[in-house]
Amino acid sequence: MNTRLLSITRILTRALPRSEIVIRRTVQQPVTFPSTRLQCRYQSTMETAKTAADQLANPAKKLKIEQKTIGTHNGAFHADEALAVYLLRLTPTYKDSPVVRSRDPPTLEACDIIVDVTGVCDHTKHFDHHQRTFTETFSEKHVTRLSSAGLIYKYFGKEIISLKTGIEETDPRVEILYQKLYSEFIEAIDANDNGISAFPSSAGAPAFSEKGITLPSMVAGLNPRWNETITDEISNSQFEKASKLMGDVFVDKLDYYSKAWLPAREIVVDAVKKRFEIDPSGKILNLGISCPWKEHLFNVEEEEGIKGETLYTLYSDGKGWRIQAVSVTKDSFENRKGLPEKWRGVRDEDLSSLTGIDGCVFVHASGFIGGNKTYEGALEMAKRAVAE
């Protein structure tokens, strides 16, 4: 290697400590300098010198990294592919990837991954759901056919959740969040794109229209208007707005479920484990604080094989303590066992006199909830309710 090239190479190595530069010699093995991901291979002395000189002349210039592209259809866009694109961009592989919107097969096939178009689903490069033969759902428990949003979420969702939360992908909590986000958010997008109504036709006409406030309708409203000039630039810009709208909602939901909803499950799990310490019946749980417990309780009961056994939960409301009856289902107003009929609608001293328990505050007229000034008082109310 000539002196000038060697000097430039040494300078380049110091200037780019994170790059891997392999200098190919005529006879000897390549000389490899430590790096992370980028590898520059110089096939000739003149090419090496030119690249090095250019880098030295432009310190801020980065060595070009090949960027992967995401393909989808052009024309009117919808909530499902808008979300699918955003989800892909949350992965390291497609972070900040440009989107190619087209229906031209060669143009699309030049992309690294294609969503919502081509009529092919191979779970590697093509993720379309419009073909007549497509019947895939999220799992055996779900009957809703996937859209491009559901497809991308099904195969990239756990990776995304792990990356956004910092929880290892193999951690059971990732599976819980993965299922929750699909059931509470993604599935509705799948259903909407596939023309599936949330209500049977026998339910009759809705009392009012909610189209203007649903995410799919808001995305539809971002499409260029029929009576204005429409260019690819305008359409693509509006698509990016739609993708961000859908993605922001997804990220917000993941943030809530991982930081607020999921920690509540741990509280319920702990309360179930300690239920016999609270009362020998095992039918009373002390949650300690108010939290979104109901759904978790039903899930934990089923996991532990104690379905239907819990009757009441206790928790602090910041000023006193509440006793709440467990409903028959997580969305039901019917309770497994409501608070005693004779307590319902009675308050304060009258309630304390009636029950013989100090500190009573109230019992709701329906018997689903009551209050006491102290934990001891609320626990005694729960014990009496279990016994009656």
Language-model features and meaning:
Residues 1-45:
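N-terminal mitochondrial targeting presequence
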Residues 4, 14, 58, 64, ...:
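Short, flexible coil/linker elements and helix-boundary hinge sites characteristic
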Residues 96-98, 170-171, 266-268, 304-306:
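Short amphipathic alpha-helical surface micro-motifs
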Residues 186-290:
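Hydrophobic, aromatic-enriched interface-forming segments
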Residues 266, 273-388:
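Gly/His-enriched, cation/cofactor- and phosphate-binding structural elements
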